[in-house]
Amino acid sequence: MSGPRFGSGVALLVVDVQNDFAHPKGSLSVRGAEAVIEEINDLIRDARAAGSPVVYTQDWHPPSTPHFDKDGGIWPVHCVADSWGAQFHPKLVLEGPYVRKGVGGEDGYSGFTMRHPVADEPVSTGLHELLREHEVAHVVVVGLATDYCVKFTALEALELGLETTVVRSAIAAVDVESGDGERALAEMVEAGAVVA
């Protein structure tokens, strides 16, 4: 299957390629994550060469948040603001703006919106506004993890009316339960995404 086409109206979204997810010593390391970084870098270069914007998402949590198991959530502490784990993986090519998720303790997985920890209302990360500034109608989604942040970013992109492509060779899954990644891909396809 051929890869995505970049150009006018198309943006590449690089989801959460950070040390805590992508590095083997990360607190929530995703198996196979380092192996997809070069493919992601190739797509970044292709997008930039075609004049497409590249936008990164970055998990950026306070030390205490309902997202963490120590505070009642389900995940180990990860991507705490200004920590090594929150930094982008050193092998990732960085050529574009980024939006941060969870800065104020919000919970969720999408690169577009999170849930306010008290009001339980959506809080924008600024991603949709950034894409509108660039007149983006189609997003290509890559990064980590297939079954969480990639999936919810792709699903919300579709809800916002954006054509959405997910590049199979440039994602990796947490697979808390065996097969979660494949089920997430099927859910994205059912919602209207193209898997390339």
Q: Which stretches of residues belong to each language-model region?
A:
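Aromatic/hydrophobic pocket-lining residues that form the small-molecule binding cavity
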Residues: 36, 40, 124, 150
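Histidine/lysine/aspartate-rich catalytic loop segments that bind and position anionic ligands
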Residues: 93-130
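Hydrophobic, well-ordered secondary-structure segments
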Residues: 85, 89, 124, 128, ...
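Hydrophobic, aromatic-enriched interface-forming segments
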Residues: 109, 118-120, 134-140, 153
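Short, surface-exposed loop/turn motifs that are enriched in glycine and acidic residues
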Residues: 77-82, 116-120, 143
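Histidine-anchored nucleotide/phosphate-binding helix
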Residues: 43-44, 150-161
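Glycine-rich anion-binding loop/nest that anchors nucleotide
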Residues: 136-152, 166-168
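Active-site acidic carboxylates
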Residues: 1-105, 133, 137, 162-166, ...
